[in-house]
C-alpha cells in the first residue's frame, strides 16, 4: 500500500494523475463475471459486420446471429394484438381511430387507467401495476388448473433475469464455509454463473445426463450437494425447465422428485420457466413447479419455498426488448417478502411498457373478442414453425458424422455435441482457447455463423458442444445447418 501511495505521489509530481478506478482497484467480483452469450464471439461478429459494411471482402455476405434467443431480430413478426394495445397506450389519441379493434381499445384503456396520470410514462409502484399483477395471478390459476395464486405474491420485473438476480441477492449470505452455495444445472444459462460470481456466492454444479436426453438425475443432485457441503452452505437449487441451452422438458415425475429432494435437504427452489410455451416434442408437456408442489399436498405444498419466473422475451411472443417479466413466490417468510419488496423499490419500478406487455401475454384475447381469431392464428403459426425447426435441426445434425444432437423437446436452442480432432484441441490450447471456442471462432471467420461454445455454458470434461438458436427463418435455417455440417467436416479433415 505504501509503495502504491509513493507511486501516486511521484506521478503527481510529474504532472500525471493516476486513475482511481483500475483493474486492480475495481470490484474483484465483477472481474470474475463472464457471460458467454454476449462474449468474445459476439464481439468478433460485430466487428465482422462493420467490416462487411465497409466493403471488406469475406467468404460470406452476412453474419448470421444464431447465438441468442432474440426472435424478432431473426425476423419473427410481433403479435398484432400486442402491438395494437401498446400503440394505443403509448399514443392514446389513437383510441378514437377506427383502425383499431374495440377489444384492443378496452385493454389499453384499462392499462392507462391504472397508470399515474393515465400515462405509460409514469412510474408504477415497485412491485408492478396492480391490475396487471391480478391478471398474472389469474393466468397462473388457469395454467395450473384452478390452483389459487395471490397477486401479493407476484412481483413484476425487468425481464425474468432481473427477478432471478434479485432473488439470489436475498439468498446469498455468510462467509467462508458458511457462504451460500447455489446448485445450478450444467450446462446452464450463463446468467446464473455470472450473477453468482458478482454476488461472490459459491456455484455448485450438477450435471444433466446427456446420454438420457439431458435428464435431471436425483443421484447427481445428491452427489453435488454432499461434495459442496465441505466448502459452503448449499441453500438454493435452480432448475431451468424447459432447458436452456439443452432444450429438455422435465417430466412430472422428475419435478416431484426434485421437490422432495429440495424439501428433505432444506433448499430454496428457483424454477426458471420462461420457455413454458415452447414445448414441441410429442409426449412432452410443461408442468409448473407451483402446480406440482401444490398437488403433492402437505408438507411440500405448505412448507417448500419456491420462486418461479416467466418472461415476455420467449414463448411465441419474442418481445425481448420490452423487458417484461414476473416472479411468483410461494411459502416465503412474510418478513423476508417485505425485504424483497424493499429491494425491488430501490430500482423504482420495471419498465411500464414491459409491464403492459406482460399483462397482454397473460390475458390475451378470448374467443368472444374480435381479435381472437387473428391472435390465435399468429400464435399457432409461430409455435408450429418453431416445432418444425426444432425437428429439422435435430435431424440434420444427427445425419452429420461427428455431430450428435439430443431431441430439442422445448425452448429455442439445440446443443449438439461435436467431435474435435486432437490436433484441433492442441492448436486451441496453444492459442489459450477452449477447443470449442476455437471451433466457433473458425466457424464465424469462414461462414459468418455466430454460435456460442459449450464451454460458456459448462459441460462434462472432454466433451465439446455449441449452442445454436433455432429462430432463423426456415429457408435461412436450412442453409445455416448445411453450412455448419459442411464446415465441421472440413474442420475435422483439416486437423486430422
UniProtKB/Swiss-Prot annotation:
Its cofactor is pyridoxal 5'-phosphate. Mainly expressed in liver, intestine, colon and white adipose tissue. The keyword Cytoplasm applies. Signal peptide: none annotated. Pfam families: Aminotran_1_2. The modification Phosphothreonine is found at residue 22. GO terms for molecular function: L-alanine:2-oxoglutarate aminotransferase activity; pyridoxal phosphate binding. Catalyzes the reversible transamination between alanine and 2-oxoglutarate to form pyruvate and glutamate. Participates in cellular nitrogen metabolism and also in liver gluconeogenesis starting with precursors transported from skeletal muscles. Belongs to the class-I pyridoxal-phosphate-dependent aminotransferase family. Alanine aminotransferase subfamily. Homodimer. This is Alanine aminotransferase 1. It comes from Mus musculus. The gene is Gpt.
Amino acid at each position: 500500500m505504501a509503495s502504491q501511495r509513493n507511486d501516486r505521489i511521484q506521478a503527481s509530481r510529474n504532472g500525471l494523475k493516476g486513475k482511481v478506478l483500475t483493474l486492480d482497484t475495481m470490484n474483484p467480483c465483477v472481474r470474475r463475471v463472464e457471460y458467454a452469450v454476449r462474449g468474445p464471439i459476439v464481439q468478433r461478429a460485430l466487428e465482422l459486420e462493420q467490416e462487411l459494411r465497409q466493403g471488406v471482402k469475406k467468404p460470406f455476405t452476412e453474419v448470421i446471429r444464431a447465438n441468442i434467443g432474440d426472435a424478432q431480430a431473426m425476423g419473427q413478426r410481433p403479435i398484432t394484438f400486442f402491438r395494437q394495445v401498446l400503440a394505443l397506450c403509448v399514443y392514446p389519441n389513437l383510441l378514437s381511430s377506427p383502425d383499431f379493434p374495440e377489444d384492443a381499445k378496452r385493454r389499453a384503456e384499462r392499462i392507462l387507467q391504472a397508470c399515474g396520470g393515465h400515462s405509460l410514462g409514469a412510474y408504477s409502484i415497485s412491485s408492478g401495476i396492480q391490475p396487471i399483477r391480478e391478471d398474472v395471478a389469474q393466468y397462473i390459476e388457469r395454467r395450473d388448473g384452478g390452483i389459487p395464486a395471490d397477486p401479493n405474491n407476484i412481483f413484476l420485473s425487468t425481464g425474468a433475469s432481473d427477478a432471478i438476480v434479485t432473488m439470489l441477492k436475498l439468498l446469498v449470505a455468510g462467509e467462508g464455509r458458511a457462504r451460500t452455495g447455489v446448485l445450478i444445472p450444467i450446462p446452464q444459462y450463463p446468467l446464473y454463473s455470472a450473477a453468482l460470481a458478482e454476488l461472490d456466492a459459491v456455484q455448485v454444479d450438477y450435471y444433466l445426463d446427456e446420454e438420457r436426453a439431458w435428464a435431471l438425475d436425483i443421484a447427481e443432485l445428491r452427489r453435488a450437494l454432499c461434495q459442496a457441503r465441505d466448502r459452503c452452505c448449499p441453500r438454493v437449487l435452480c432448475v431451468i425447465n424447459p432447458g436452456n441451452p439443452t432444450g429438455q422438458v422435465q417430466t412430472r415425475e422428475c419435478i416431484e422428485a426434485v421437490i422432495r429432494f429440495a424439501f428433505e435437504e432444506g433448499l430454496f427452489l428457483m424454477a426458471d420457466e420462461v420457455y413454458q410455451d415452447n414445448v414441441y416434442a410429442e409426449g412432452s408437456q410443461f408442468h409448473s413447479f407451483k402446480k406440482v408442489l401444490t398437488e403433492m399436498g402437505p408438507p411440500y405444498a405448505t412448507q417448500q419455498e419456491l420462486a418461479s419466473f416467466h418472461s415476455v422475451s420467449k414463448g411465441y411472443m419474442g418481445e425481448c426488448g420490452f423487458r417484461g417479466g414476473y416472479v411468483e413466490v410461494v411459502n416465503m417468510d412474510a418478513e423476508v417478502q417485505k425485504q424483497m419488496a424493499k429491494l425491488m423499490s430501490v430500482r423504482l419500478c420495471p419498465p411500464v411498457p414491459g409491464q403492459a406487455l406482460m399483462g397482454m401475454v397473460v390475458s390475451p384475447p378470448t374467443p368472444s373478442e374480435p381479435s381472437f381469431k387473428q391472435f390465435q392464428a399468429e400464435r399457432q403459426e409461430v409455435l408450429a414453425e418453431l416445432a418444425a425447426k426444432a425437428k429439422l435441426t435435430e435431424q440434420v445434425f444427427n445425419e452429420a458424422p461427428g455431430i450428435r444432437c439430443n431431441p430439442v423437446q422445448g425452448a429455442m436452442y439445440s446443443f449438439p455435441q461435436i467431435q474435435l480432432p486432437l490436433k484441433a484441441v492442441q492448436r486451441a490450447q496453444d492459442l489459450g482457447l477452449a477447443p470449442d471456442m476455437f471451433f466457433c471462432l473458425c466457424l464465424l471467420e469462414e461462414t459468418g455463423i455466430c454460435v456460442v461454445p459449450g464451454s460458456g455454458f459448462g459441460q462434462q470434461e472432454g466433451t465439446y458442444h455449441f449452442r445454436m438458436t433455432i429462430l432463423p427463418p426456415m429457408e435461412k435455417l436450412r442453409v445455416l445447418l448445411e453450412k455448419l455440417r459442411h464446415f465441421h467436416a472440413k474442420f475435422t479433415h483439416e486437423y486430422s
